[in-house]
Amino acid sequence: MPATPRLHRKRFAPLAIAASLVASTTLGLSATGTLSAFTASITNSNNTAATGSLIMQETDSAGTTSCLSTSGTGNAYTSCSTINKYGGTTNQLTPGGAPNVTTVRLYNTGTTAVNGFTLAPGTCTKSGSGTGDLCGQLQLTLTCAPVTGGTAGTAVTLYNAVALNALGASKDIKAASATCVPPTSSTDYVRFTFSVQLSSSADNTVQAQSVSQPLVWTYTGA
């Protein structure tokens, strides 16, 4: 009976070899990528984004002297000393006399609309030999009016004969009048008129005094 095992091995050897060849061929096709399929794709090659800008510009009444927010660090210019809204020390005031009147223009030359607009008066400080407090005797009347196409709109009063030391921490100009918010424009603006007058009740204690008070305009973007 020794011949039987040899015949059995001979009968199945070709089948095993064939199966091995088929597996090798399939594996080879898979590895070399010769098997293919339909595909589809889209590449969006132009995906961009940008931010808008808020740029405040203040000029004198003639539009010849100008300060820009971009002149300072972080779009906040803190050294605009060329535009004096209280009239300066040359035009000296007397009790109940004529006021110092100054006008300025506020523009938004950026690309983003102004959503909030405030004016923050700083601390009024006096100097001079008098013993009285001139900050409490000088009164400010402030109005604003939009100017579109060279034509001024209706003026709105923001302060009406308020003492400089009582102006408060901040004035919400948009809340007072949305028409006084500068548009996004290089030509249209808001005109602010500052009128500073010495109270008729002022006495000799405020003679030979002067005052100084910083004013901070702030735009907030939409």
Region locations from a protein language model:
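Long, small/polar-residue-biased beta-strand-and-loop interaction regions
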Residues: P2-A222
